[in-house]
Amino acid sequence: MRNVARLPESDRRELFRNTADKMGLNDAIVEKDFWVCFTLDYLFHRCPWKGAITFKGGTSLSKAFNLISRFSEDIDLILDWRVLGYSKDEPWEKRSNTKQDAFNKEANARAEVFLAEQFCPTIQVELSQELGCEANIYIDEKDKQTVIFAYPHLFTNSATLQVIRLEIGALAAWTPAKIAQIEPYAATYYPKVFAQKDTAILTVAPERTFWEKATILHHEANRPESSEMPQRYSRHYYDLYRMSMTPVKEAAFAQVELLKTVVDFKMKFYPRAWAKYQEATPGTLKLVPPEYRLDALAEDYANMRDMLYGNIPSFEEVMKVIQNLEKEINSIKK
């Protein structure tokens, strides 16, 4: 991948455009996909903290496990909290609600300092060396736990930002995880251009991500009417729809104890009374949002369609499957 990153602009432009034509995707999306894979390869193989991070989230579902046909713009990373000075089990110690809240805030503050003072300056220097030019890397002003890599883009597209967001948090569970191979779209279609066409990345197991997504939908089903659902949240419904069509669903059902692990984690580190996480268990789990949410969710899904490829289901089809999945989960015997 490094050889492609340093190709003349005209060669990269031709590579990304030809790949996009073959896939029926926008040029800018194919280009960004390459830089996402390049960045992952650097982070997990050459970065000083390569042994202290785990890949998670929607991008892992598409790139690592080929479970969804959705282009994901961001890289979600779990940072081993031992990098921040905590012992392995320290965050799990029993505390009062007040003390736990203080601990959570302190852990997030430590992560922000680490990213600003160590991580960001280091990768800026190292990626500049790899690219042979100044790498544009900085902390997001609105989210201090997000590092932005403004990669050297040749194409633009209003549906996607020409930057990669590295969303890095220490308050996340990094098990179970497995090694997965990740390959840029361009390498799939033009493998001979690449000296190295794929990379091995430590990634959260999709069974856990299945239950993570299910608890997000439960959270949204309980969101107060006065509170708007965040933009692009329809992606979570689509992701769970697609995962439910794969063997991951049965694997997740066979490991239903993972759901409790996910719920316990969220209740400890991301508590929110109205989310009713204690009800996110077989028998009472909610995936389907209230009727009054559906129009806004359908509009959000329509706005996200540019990020989907292959056989794109209708919103109605997605919600029908989600409704059936809710019934299936609630019929699981504990």
Per-region residue spans from a language model:
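Betabetaalpha-Me/HNH-type nuclease active-site subdomain
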Residues: 62
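Structured mid-to-C-terminal alpha-helical surface segments
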Residues: 1-53, 65-69, 81-334
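Glycine-rich beta-strand-to-loop/alpha-helix junction loops that act as flexible
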Residues: 55-59
